[in-house]
Swiss-Prot record:
It is found in: Cell inner membrane. The keyword Secreted does not apply. NCBIfam families: murG. This is UDP-N-acetylglucosamine--N-acetylmuramyl-(pentapeptide) pyrophosphoryl-undecaprenol N-acetylglucosamine transferase. CDD domains: GT28_MurG.
Length: 356
């Protein structure tokens, strides 16, 4: 070889696509690879990825779900433009391998990578594959999945998650050394989760004072004031935060996590080895958050409550019925279903397929 190998990561739109792509990018860069990212100027990747000193290429292409007739009518033209932009980017970058991590932009770029003979690796983060990956899986050299049996011929690698989660102590060591009230971590994500913000304070208020858990509740900057008002109205003390810098430590300190069921959240809960109650976002595409959560809940490794069934009374009863030994068993089962080597495995496959 005349120089370092080059990885082109295609990912955009949401953190669920971008963060696992970054994990693989860092792993290969530590091995001497050059990394370039292909995304959309309007996606979160446009501001997040450059902070990791990764150069970017951009194409213009968006989704169709929920869009009007004009957008659908213009699809052929927009797709043709995205194809040409992808070809130009691929010729500039000359990647040794292309890694598609999801998002609409992966479709035109992935198709052109295959057409130009570049090795194409796909990774699907959710339990139900997105439309772009369903199509690209037919032309990809390797198909990788975070959950079992998501795409035909796919290898179950798990989701690449933040490295520090794999280094946490075993659930048995963490749970056995605790005493006193349960510790509950509520995670709403960067945008918050209004249903959790409303129901959790009311549920805790229904518990007798001596049976109340210690609560840390993360809600996102836009909802933090409302959340704090909800706890004040319920007369429940809680640590309320707009964001959490050290999620690994937050997971490690919790007996129970109450959260949505995005692919990365489910994977992080398993990797950390912590008990969880998943409340899937009811409007997720193809209801994929429910099937994400079922990967753990059907094995007794998590609880699953649909948002329509989430009430203060029901949540209070559930919390009152849980014991630390029960939660420890749940956490142990969750850790057993984790794929701690996901980042290394995806990077390894990229290395195997790379060519000049």
């Amino acid at each position: 070889m005349t120089g370092p190998r080059t990885l082109l990561v295609m990912a955009g739109g949401t953190g669920g696509h971008v963060f696992p792509g970054l994990a693989v990018a860092h792993a290969l860069r530590e091995q001497g690879w050059k990394v370039v990212w292909l995304g959309n100027r309007t996606g979160m990747e446009a501001t997040l990825v450059p902070k990791h000193d990764i150069p970017m290429e951009f194409i213009q292409f968006g989704g169709l779900r929920g869009k009007g007739l004009v957008t659908k009518f213009l699809l052929p033209l927009n797709l043709l433009r995205a194809f040409w932009q992808s070809i130009a980017a691929l010729r500039r970058v000359r990647p040794s391998v292309v890694l598609g991590m999801g998002g609409y932009i992966t479709f035109p770029a992935g198709m052109m990578a295959s057409l130009l003979g570049r090795p194409l690796v796909l990774h699907e983060q959710n339990s139900i594959a997105g439309l772009a990956n369903k199509v690209l899986a037919k032309v990809a050299d390797r198909v990788l999945c975070a959950f079992p049996d998501t795409l035909p011929g796919g290898e179950w690698t798990g989701n690449p998650v933040r490295e520090e989660l794999a280094h946490l102590d075993a659930p048995e060591a963490r749970y056995d050394q605790r005493s006193g009230p349960l510790r509950i971590l509520v995670v709403g994500g960067s945008l918050g989760a209004a249903a959790l913000n409303e129901v959790v304070p009311k549920a805790i208020a229904l518990l007798p004072g001596g049976e109340r858990p210690v609560v840390t509740h993360q809600a996102g900057a836009k909802q933090i004031d409302t959340l704090r008002a909800n706890y004040a109205a319920a007369q429940v003390p809680a640590q309320t935060l707009p964001f959490i810098d050290d999620m690994a430590r937050a997971y490690a300190d919790a007996d129970l996590v109450i959260c949505r069921a995005g692919a990365m959240t489910v994977s992080e809960v398993a990797a950390a080895g912590v008990a969880a109650m998943f409340v899937p976002f009811p409007h997720a595409v193809d209801d994929h958050q429910t099937t994400n959560a079922e990967f753990l809940s059907k094995q007794g490794a998590a609880l699953l409550v649909q948002q329509k069934d989430l009430t203060a009374e029901g949540l209070a009863q559930t919390i009152a019925s849980l014991t630390r030994p029960q939660l420890k068993d749940m956490a142990r089962l969750a850790r057993g279903l984790a794929k701690p080597e996901a980042t290394r495995r995806v990077a390894e496959i990229c290395s195997q397929l790379a060519r000049d």
